[in-house]
Each structure stands twice: as C-alpha cells, then as structure tokens.
Amino acid sequence: MIKYQIDWQSFKEKYIKPKKGEFPTGTRVYKGFQGSGKTLSMISDIYQCRTIFPKAIIFSNVKLKNIDYHFIKDSGDLKKALETQNGKDGVLVCIDEAHLFFNKKDGISLDVITCISQQRKDRRKIFFTCQIWEDLDVSLRKQVKEVVTCHRVGRLQINKIIDGESVRFDKQLGTWTGQTIQYNIFKHNERLYNSYDTFQKIINNRDYERNTNTLPIYYSQDRAGKKIVVK
C-alpha cells in the first residue's frame, strides 16, 4: 500500500505569482545544416528581444548592425557574458556555431555549466546555433529548454520549436525526436540580411581550449572577396 505524506501547513502559506512580462530565461538551440536559416532565425529573435526588452544587455559572437551589444571575441568575453548581471532587465548571450566551442570531444568546464544551469536566477537567456544536435556536449544538451529545428523553403523560413526536455533518440526512426511546442514562420528579407555580417565565418577552432584565452579566429570579406581578420 502506498502512503501519502501531505504538508497541510504549506496550504496556508502565501504564494506570489511570477510577474508577467519578465525577461525570459533558458537555453534555446537553433539546429540545421548550412543554408537551413538557423543563424538568420537566431538574428531575427535577437532583434525581437531587443524590441520587447530594450534594457537587456546583449552579447554575441556574430557581428550585429544597428543595435547596442557586446561582441564576444575571446573566452574572456564569453566568461563575462555568462557572469554579467542585469537584474530583471535580463542578459541575452548568443553563440553561433556553438558545436565548435562546446563539443562532446572537449567537454565543458564546470564553471560554464554552472552559469548555464542558473540562468533563471540570473534572468539570462542563451541562444546557440549548431549543425548537428549530437555534436554538442551531452552536459549542455541536458540544459537546453528549447530546440529549434530550422527549415528554409525558398525565402520562407519554417521553424519547429521542440521542448528540450522531451528530446530523445528514436532508434526506429534513427533520429532525434521531441514534443513540438509551436511553429514559427517568417519570410527572409533585406532588413534581416543587413542586420548582421553575413560574410563572417569561423574557420579555425584548433587553438580553443576551455582554460585558455583563445577562441576561433573570425574572418570577414570585403566586396572583392579579400579576407579580413575581425579583431
């Protein structure tokens, strides 16, 4: 026979509902192969976040345009992004190609996992993009609140948002599945294309280590196609 232990005193205690409109928290991963629109989808959400929460502090390793933000160029900047406090106004941290930084081969340091796992307390939202879900370190995958599967059909972007806690590998289907929360659909446009550096590339990750002060080297291109180091 199963017994139940009920704390009757707790029913007398006052409960304060969370305030509506507070800065959202949790990790969202945009996944998809090259050309699927995952980076553009993240960029779109960054600008929407800025519109709704104008006082939020934004960190990004993508070079953004016409918006106040802090560029993440090395591990020191990343550490600062994960530790910055901004009260109820929130902090948004955006990492493109996260699988190059936090992969299952190299693992993730405990301090990074600690910062990510305490996002709700810090009013922090983290956006990652990656090409392959399983390339992310498993300790990071366990912290993901939402997985956005990105699909591009012409200039139409169709994204399926999945509950991160429900993601499981289906052996019969041979793929990762999860509970669908909603679909987001938008059309590609010049305003979005011009809101970030579309030529920026991460081409080198061999020098990155969890306990060093180096991250991948960023390159851009001028109109003639000449490579330019982004400092």
Write out the residue ranges for each language-model feature.
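Conserved nucleotide-sensing/catalytic segment adjacent to the nucleotide-binding pocket
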Residues: 65-122
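Conserved P-loop NTPase motor module
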Residues: 146, 160, 166-231
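Pre-Walker A adenine-sensing motif
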Residues: 3-23
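Conserved lysine of the Walker
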Residues: 38-39
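Post-Walker A helix-loop "phosphate-sensing" segment adjacent to the P-loop in P-loop NTPases
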Residues: 48-57
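Hydrophobic anchor at the beta1->P-loop junction of P-loop NTPases
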Residues: 30-32
